Amino acid sequence: MRLSVTKEDASGMQKILAFFRGEVVLTAALVLALLSFLLMPPSAAAFASVDVSTLCMLFALMAVVAGLRSCGLFDWLAAGVKARVRTCRGLGFLLMSLCFFFSMVITNDVALLTFVPFTLLLLADAGAFALMWTVVLETIAANLGSMMTPIGNPQNLYLYMSRGLALGDFVQTLLPYALVSYILLALGTLLLPAQRRETAQESAPALARDRLVLYLVLLAVCLLSVLKVLPAWVAAVVVALAVALRQPDLLGKVDWALLATFLCFFVFVGNVKAAPVVSQTLEQLLTGRETLVAVVCSQVISNVPATLLLAPFTQNVTGLLLGVNLGGLGTLVASLASLISFKLYGRSQGAQRGRYLLLFTVANFGLLALLLLLVWVLG
């Protein structure tokens, strides 16, 4: 019997391959999950390691943030910045600050997706260095600002939801590093030129106020879940129903690939943990070196996968929490949010990718070294 492949089949296969090429982290997670079944045969235990609460909370937050963006909230805020600040240095400071503080609520990825495109338009005529340096500062600010809250980035959410961290302990662990980071970033804006810039008066973008109220209420529901007042699944169901009824197209804007990546890593870690030799090796490697190992691991595989890989093999959750957050500094892949900025900048007119990457790397490793020195000083 002869098998024939139609054009539709070939086109479908090309789309699937293109999807996996575009989702490198998901592809790697899927391969690792499948390979891990060579260590341990498929069983219910592998899927018992899946943290459903984390997946529910991630989904709810991504849907709510997509809703807030669709209301024009972030465009409205950005327009307000443009209207009130007249110098390049002042704009750099405010844009960096917006990324730093907004990332605590809307995540580092979304903060960069929101403010970097605006930066590229606003500072297009400010000179190559001013534009690159502002985007670098925004990227670092989003990565480090997001560490201050359990919902700021996926690794925080996972550790907070799965390891029973108290909110007070969480904040106490990271607050000194966030404060020092913000001060250093503020000083970094002094490298920007201080000349005044003339900007045309523009009307502020309209806000969809009815939907804005809805998504702010849903954000409050998510925060109640983070504070452990409501179960995560309740928040996910409430958000899913509200979005499906009010704005169903937003469900397509949820990062389903990120959720699938988490699922694959949960399965991988469950199988690895069940293999005595591997689990004992990882436990010995981590003991007493949680922060440093997490930083180094993040440089290679990014901090979210590093968290999922290392978390089951240590009881020192605060050390790991600190390591995977500081580990977002360093290489371009240390935090996948950094790739967002790089791609956005790389598409801009006159982009100097090599120079940007050099500036990014020097700034990241310089700040990482200073913060690791602070870790040593604080003991």
Regions found by a protein language model. Name each.
Residues 171-182, 292-379:
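C-terminal transmembrane helix pair
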Residues 52-54, 82-96, 125-134, 209-213, ...:
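Membrane-interfacial loop-to-helix junctions in multi-pass transporters
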Residues 3-5, 14-45, 57-72, 191-194, ...:
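Structural signal for alpha-helical transmembrane segments and their membrane-water exit/capping regions
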Residues 127-194, 199-204, 342-371:
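Membrane-core helix-loop-helix motifs of multi-pass transport proteins
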Residues 79, 191-216, 247-252:
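Flexible interhelical linker loops that connect adjacent transmembrane helices
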Residues 49, 71, 75-78, 218-315:
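Transmembrane helical segments that form the transport core of multi-pass membrane transport proteins
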Residues 95-97, 101-144, 308-322, 350-354, ...:
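Hydrophobic transmembrane alpha-helices that form the pore/transport pathway of multi-pass ion
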Residues 16-22, 44-54, 165-177, 204-209, ...:
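Interfacial loop-to-helix junctions that mark the boundaries of transmembrane helices
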